[in-house]
């Protein structure tokens, strides 16, 4: 099937979906209606671009016809030639756009994410930088109209973050933040440095798609659930009723503890969201490691410890090492203006996939 047959098939399916979504039997079946609505929405951009492309092809035919029928009218012929030139340029642009729209979609792109940030090498300074990254993602989420909820956080004595787990919810969150997983390195003079020397520290970021229970079923026999009293500052028990929850996935020894909420059930629900995402991510990473050819076509190696980005404060510079992008905009990027970085990563990924497709 060539690209035009693929596009026609997508348009035919889109029109079929439109009819199905107006069928009373489908409307009354909430689950099916939502599935079909999601499928229709996922193909809308492709169909719109394809229809515009077909109009451009018609414009080329019309312009060529006008040139033939100009009958010696120099002005009319000149106008038709300009229209033909413009339409041919548009045709090339649409063909590139349509190739990208037909690339295989990441099934997780529309999902919410669970975001984990940890201070790594560098002690207090690494944990302070982890806090800076948390604020950066919070501000970016706000600019995108997403909901950002801190689910669990552990702080050090100087205001830094040892570890934080957050849920980011909204439209296409994973598609934009999936490239953030990896080691983020910072170069700056710590507030505790009296000699003015630049130190290098690292924080790690992990982005996982939220996995619904119906998508990934964990056998209850593989889980150990412990209930205990939530503790406050200094380790004292703050609740008379045991509300804190610890869940361990026995086959992988992945563990989640949750005590942020006031009730045991809410802590359990949040812990299950996180452990489902971590376990699914664990096995997805194993599968990815086994697919060397596929890994070559993704940004970076896929190694979670891979250094992906450096934030150099003295030079106000951010460098993304995977795509060779350098921006002298560290202050604005840490203020949540991540669009330029995200767009460059998305474009690079699309380019790599197109090259794979054309081999």
Curated annotation (Swiss-Prot):
Family: Belongs to the prokaryotic/mitochondrial release factor family.
Source organism of the structure: Streptococcus gordonii (strain Challis / ATCC 35105 / BCRC 15272 / CH1 / DL1 / V288)
Biased composition (Basic and acidic residues): 293-307
Assigned GO CC terms: cytoplasm
Localization (cell): Cytoplasm
PTM info: Methylated by PrmC. Methylation increases the termination efficiency of RF1.
Stated name of the protein: Peptide chain release factor 1
A Pfam cross-reference name: PCRF
NCBIfam families the record matches: prfA, PRK00591.1
UniProt-listed InterPro entries: PCRF, Pep_chain_release_fac_I, Pep_chain_release_fac_I_sf, Prokaryotic/Mito_RF, RF-1
SMART domains found in the cross-reference section: PCRF (SM00937)
Chain residue ranges for the region called Disordered: 288-307
């Amino acid at each position: 099937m060539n690209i035009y047959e693929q596009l026609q098939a997508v348009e035919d399916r889109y029109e079929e979906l439109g009819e199905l979504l107006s069928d009373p039997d489908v409307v009354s079946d909430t689950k099916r209606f939502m599935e079909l609505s999601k499928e229709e929405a996922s193909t809308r951009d492709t169909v719109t671009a394809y229809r515009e492309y077909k109009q451009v092809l018609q414009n080329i035919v019309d312009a060529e016809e006008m040139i033939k029928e100009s009958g010696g009218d120099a002005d009319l012929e000149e106008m038709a030639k300009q229209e033909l030139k413009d339409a041919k340029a548009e045709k090339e642009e649409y063909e590139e756009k349509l190739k990208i729209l037909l690339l295989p979609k990441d099934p997780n792109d529309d999902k919410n994410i669970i975001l984990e940030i940890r201070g790594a090498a560098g002690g207090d300074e690494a944990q302070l930088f982890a806090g800076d990254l948390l604020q950066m993602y919070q501000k970016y989420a706000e600019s995108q109209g997403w909901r950002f909820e801190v689910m669990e956080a552990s702080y050090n004595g100087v205001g830094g973050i040892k570890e934080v787990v957050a849920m980011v919810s909204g439209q296409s969150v994973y598609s934009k933040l999936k490239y953030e997983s990896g080691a983020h390195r910072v170069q700056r003079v710590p507030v505790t440095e009296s000699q003015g020397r630049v130190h290098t520290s690292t924080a790690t970021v992990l982005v996982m798609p939220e996995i619904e229970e119906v998508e990934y079923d964990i056998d209850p026999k593989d889980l150990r659930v412990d209930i205990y009293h939530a503790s406050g500052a200094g380790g004292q028990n703050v609740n008379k009723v045991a509300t804190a929850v610890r869940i361990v996935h026995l086959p992988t020894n992945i563990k989640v503890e949750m005590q942020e909420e006031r009730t045991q059930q809410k802590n359990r629900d949040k812990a299950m969201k996180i452990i489902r995402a971590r376990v699914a991510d664990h096995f997805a990473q194993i599968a990815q490691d086994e697919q060397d050819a596929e890994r070559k076509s993704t940004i970076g190696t896929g190694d979670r410890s891979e250094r992906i980005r450096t934030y150099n404060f003295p030079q106000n510079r951010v460098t993304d090492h995977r795509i060779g992008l350098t921006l002298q905009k560290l202050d604005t990027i840490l203020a949540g203006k991540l669009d330029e970085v995200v767009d460059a990563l998305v474009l690079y990924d699309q380019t790599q996939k197109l090259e794979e497709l054309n081999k």
